[in-house]
Amino acid sequence: MQIEREIVFPASPDEVWEALTEPERLEEWFATEVELDAQPGGAGVFRWENGEERRAVVREAQPGERLVLDWDDEGEVVLELEEVDGGTRVHVVETAPDWSTALELHALAWTPVA
């Protein structure tokens, strides 16, 4: 099972890429504490206020275009960026074997952005 979502941001693909890959930017909207090496094979650690911690490995990173993370629970998130009139469309596809945790974190993470 997967969750699929599209969001259009009034920013360039490069600006959106920074918000998706730079730890200090991710801490503004996604998780409380972030460590991320946004290159293929790079590691990521995401911590939330509720004490939840998730680890990820960057499978694919094409700056301004596509980011794929493999989560420590065998789930994944694929983010594809596309320049559109007025900004950047981000197409998000998340898959996870344990949807109870994934849905909770999905709600915590994406609600402030949408």
Predicted features, each with a name:
Residues 34-98:
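Hydrophobic-ligand binding "helix-grip"
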Residues 8, 56-58, 106:
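Residue-level detection of beta-strand scaffold positions
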Residues 95-114:
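A conserved amphipathic terminal alpha-helix motif
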Residues 1-35:
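Hydrophobic ligand-binding cavity/cleft-lining segments
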Residues 25-27, 66, 107-108:
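Short amphipathic alpha-helical segments with coiled-coil-like heptad repeat character
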